[in-house]
Amino acid sequence: MARKKLMRFKWNDEVHNLFQPEKDNYKFYKGNWKEYFKNTNPIVLEVGCGRAEYTTGLAALNPDVNYIGLDIKGARLWKGSSLSIETGLSNTAFIRTKLQNLEEFFLPGEVNGIWITFPDPKPRESEAKLRLSGLRFMNIYRRLMPQGGKVFFKTDNKVLFDHTLEVLTNPDLKITNLVYTHDLYQSELLSEHYGIQTTYEKTYLKQGVLINYLKFEFLPL
């Protein structure tokens, strides 16, 4: 294994802001994230966060909101974890987990918002249940935010985006204020992103690929 990767794994094992299965406190804060953050500020998740550009970028802009990035790859989470510590961000945390296990880390009502940024489109029908913007995951997000909450979704994949719009027509999800664009960089919605771009996004933009974006709110149950 490359020396750099070993150093990153060692970092992940030792830092306080990254939770992974090998640590005793892996699921300790479920229902009690206010103890970790030392406040009762709103919690926003970035699911499939990769290098956590949105987790760290938004946390720097909004110190009164707590941001948690989740991903299955520890090597990706290292980036957000290390940047947070280097820049003094105390309102971030990172969790290494399969995203279908979200409810093992948060109680209903503990989450206020969710960002889904450039997820794997999982194009095969056999993988449909793994799409982070599919109905299975939307129902998970719904359960985490029974009091209502906002969801934000960005992707370069128009097929996935259109599929997501179809998913959101399901009346059981009880959503409102859906707004979307097939070309974010020609939309007034761009200002909501504060110049934050993921690594994938930068690559797609150089290739001339359009970026799709939507946001909506869950109605309180």
Over which residues does each language-model region extend?
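Conserved SAM/SAH-binding beta-strand->alpha-helix loop
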Residues: K73
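Class I S-adenosyl-L-methionine
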Residues: P171-L221
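A short glycine-rich, Lys/Arg-flanked "PGG" loop and its adjoining helix->strand segment in the class I
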Residues: S133-Q147
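S-adenosyl-L-methionine
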Residues: M1-I43, E53-A60, S81-P108
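Conserved beta-strand signature within the Rossmann-like core of class I S-adenosyl-L-methionine
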Residues: G148-T155
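Short beta-strand element of Class I
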Residues: V65-I68
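Class I SAM-dependent methyltransferase "Motif I" SAM/SAH-binding loop
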Residues: G48-G50
